């Protein structure tokens, strides 16, 4: 088995770690960053991922997709998605299967497909770093992700060419990294506020055991919402001062988004920052500039209710764990938003202790994922991880009631069975409606799937015995089966993302991703060949200029002809033609190099009697050491 990489697939940024021996190591991207923006952009010619996609977002807002994690496993008409549509510069639609998708240049991309593009970039960066092919990964998800969102994440990994060995909850991964090699037993709370999601997990860590006691959260609360509050404020202030509504201008909104994110970060360390966006828009009177000061106090006033929304899940998680805030030994902060002083203050007040900031909030989740990869590969020994399912699972029963089979915060993997019966006389089949959630009525919870158990022999209602079994694997993914105990007939369903990608669609997207990988490789080879050709032309032309009249006309004409031939093909896309022309010019330029070398030797003092009238005769031996120096007669030439 090769290396298993650990990936934190974040809303705003993603990060990759790998175990090197017993130590987790961050894999930097080619740009030198330890995290990679979770952004994909489409241009007329190519697809861009990461930093390069982020850099061009202002000039290409409608084709630059960010925060796609917020759409994973969600319906196109879900309230959260409809809310996100109002702020998003790119187009969000309901796909053919009803799931949220993005539409760029007339083509629809599922959230899993866009996430796969990000994962593909992370995979390629890991391969470049390790110098070997990477096929296995552990990918993290928010603890409060439901089954559909987990399955969509796993599908994204498959499309990117990764065998996802384990889906692990982000706070659990963070606690794994925090508790790695710790011997003391502690009850910890992992407060994880990232770019798009919030999780709180209560765990017991120590003596190489990490046990999740309870988890809670909000999968639509994060840094993107904080940025949006700042954007709304800037738009309103600019409208009040200039009478211009920037919210209608997508390019201006993208500039505002970048400025809002930067201001938010700046205010974590300073009390005031200045937002300066020249030429943000124009009207009949000319260009308009946005220049505004934003204080930390104003920012905190804008977002205080968002921070307060994190407290209730903390309260619920503690109650589910059967603990009080005073019984928590450490509160570990995870996610970039926990750098905000107001967040740290509110967390400290709720738990009654100063939060622990000893871990890197941007990297600790990926580090934990890599440690989990090491456990699965057998490289990390004697570490036991006990995770939980975040939401209750059950089926719909008579009267539209949600009957739980597995309660939330049950340790996984787990298996639970319960026997049900028919609701009518001579009922030939039963429909099993599988649900996930906490509401008492089935209609208020999320549908994971439906299947039919047919062929039940005619009998009075209440007579047939149908055993329904729920099985949750270590990834938190659900399998459900129903068995007629009278006939032994059984029917089962592996719950996939609700109305999600079919197997044939996944296979098609895998092939497309592989094809893109080949295209990207060829494109990279073409760019490298062009760069080498450009360098060769520059060096050869410089050599010709340096030699001047000392280069005979025939040689000069031959080389210049080869330079023109290379220039003609290097802007094209024929890689072999560029390589051939480069090789021909390279061979010809060797003669130049020889002549240039001889010329440089002749012009230097100590090069011999031919060095020129003003030169001295050279030493007869080399000067490697005193023993090798040979005295020689010399004649002083007087001018």
From Swiss-Prot:
Extent of Acidic residues compositional bias: 628-639
Record region (Disordered): 589-639
Modified residues (Phosphothreonine): 197
MF (Gene Ontology): ATP binding; ATP-dependent protein folding chaperone; unfolded protein binding
Short name of one Pfam family: HSP70
Induction: By stress conditions e.g. heat shock.
Keywords recorded for this protein, A-Z: ATP-binding, Chaperone, Nucleotide-binding, Phosphoprotein, Stress response
Keyword field contains Cell wall biogenesis/degradation: no
Residue stretches of biased makeup (Low complexity): 594-623
CDD domains: ASKHA_NBD_HSP70_DnaK-like
Family of this protein: Belongs to the heat shock protein 70 family.
HAMAP family noted in UniProt: DnaK
Function: Acts as a chaperone.
Name of the protein in its database record: Chaperone protein DnaK
Species of provenance: Nitratidesulfovibrio vulgaris (strain DSM 19637 / Miyazaki F) (Desulfovibrio vulgaris)
Gene: dnaK
């Amino acid at each position: 088995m090769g290396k298993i990489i650990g990936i934190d697939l974040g809303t705003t940024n993603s990060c990759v770690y790998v175990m090197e021996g017993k130590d987790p190591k961050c894999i930097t991207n080619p740009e030198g960053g330890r995290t990679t923006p979770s952004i994909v952009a489409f241009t007329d010619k190519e697809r861009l991922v990461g930093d390069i996609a982020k850099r061009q977002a202002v000039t290409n807002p409608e084709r630059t997709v960010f925060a796609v994690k917020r759409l994973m496993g969600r319906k196109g008409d879900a309230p959260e998605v409809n809310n996100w549509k109002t702020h998003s510069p790119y187009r969000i639609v309901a796909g053919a299967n009803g799931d949220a998708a993005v539409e760029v240049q007339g083509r629809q991309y599922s959230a899993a497909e866009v996430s796969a593009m990000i994962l593909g970039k992370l995979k390629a960066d890991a391969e470049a770093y390790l110098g070997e092919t990477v096929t296995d990964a552990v990918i993290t998800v928010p603890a409060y992700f439901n089954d559909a969102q987990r399955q969509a994440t796993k599908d994204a990994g498959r499309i990117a060419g990764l065998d996802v060995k384990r889906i692990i909850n982000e706070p659990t991964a963070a606690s794994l990294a925090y508790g790695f090699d710790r011997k003391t037993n502690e009850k910890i709370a992992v407060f994880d506020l990232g770019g798009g999601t919030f999780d709180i997990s209560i765990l017991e860590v120590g003596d190489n055991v990490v046990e999740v006691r309870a988890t809670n959260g909000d999968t639509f609360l994060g840094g993107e919402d904080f940025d949006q509050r700042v954007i709304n404020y800037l738009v309103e202030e600019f409208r009040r001062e200039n009478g211009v509504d920037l919210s209608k201008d997508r390019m201006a909104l993208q500039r505002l988004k970048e400025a809002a994110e930067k201001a938010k970060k700046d205010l974590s360390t300073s009390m005031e920052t200045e937002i300066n966006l020249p030429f943000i828009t124009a009207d009949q009177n000319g260009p308009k500039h946005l220049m505004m000061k934003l204080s930390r106090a104003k920012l905190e006033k804008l977002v205080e209710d968002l921070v307060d929304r994190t407290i209730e899940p903390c309260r619920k998680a503690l109650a589910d764990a059967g603990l009080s805030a005073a019984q928590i030994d450490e509160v570990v902060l995870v996610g970039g938003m926990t750098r905000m002083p107001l967040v740290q203050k509110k967390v400290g007040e709720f738990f009654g202790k100063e939060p622990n900031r000893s871990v890197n909030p941007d990297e600790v989740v990926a580090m934990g994922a890599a440690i989990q990869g090491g456990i699965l590969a057998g490289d990390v020994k004697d570490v036991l991880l006990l995770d939980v399912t975040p939401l209750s699972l059950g089926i719909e029963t008579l009267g539209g009631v949600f009957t739980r089979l597995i309660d939330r915060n049950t340790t996984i993997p787990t298996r639970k069975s319960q026997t049900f019966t028919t609701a009518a006389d001579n009922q030939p089949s039963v429909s099993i409606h599988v649900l996930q959630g906490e509401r008492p009525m089935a209609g208020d919870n999320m549908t994971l799937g439906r299947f039919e158990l047919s062929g039940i022999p005619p009998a009075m209602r209440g007579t047939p015995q149908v055993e329904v079994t729920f099985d949750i694997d270590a990834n938190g993914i659900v399998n459900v089966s129903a068995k007629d105990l009278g006939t032994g007939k059984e029917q089962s369903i592996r719950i996939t993302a609700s109305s999600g990608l079919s197997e044939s669609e996944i296979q098609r997207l895998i092939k497309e991703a592989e094809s893109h990988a080949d295209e990207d490789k060829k494109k990279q080879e073409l760019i490298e060949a062009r760069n080498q050709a450009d360098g060769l032309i520059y060096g050869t032309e410089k050599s010709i200029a340096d030699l001047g009249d000392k280069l005979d006309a025939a040689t000069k004409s031959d080389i210049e002809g080869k330079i023109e031939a290379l220039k003609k093909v290097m802007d094209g896309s024929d890689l072999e033609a560029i390589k051939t022309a480069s090789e021909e010019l390279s061979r010809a330029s060797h003669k130049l190099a020889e002549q240039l070398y001889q010329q440089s030797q002749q012009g230097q003092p100590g090069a011999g009697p031919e060095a020129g009238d003003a030169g001295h005769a050279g030493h007869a031996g080399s000067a490697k050491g005193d023993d090798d120096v040979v005295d020689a007669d010399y004649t002083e030439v007087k001018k």
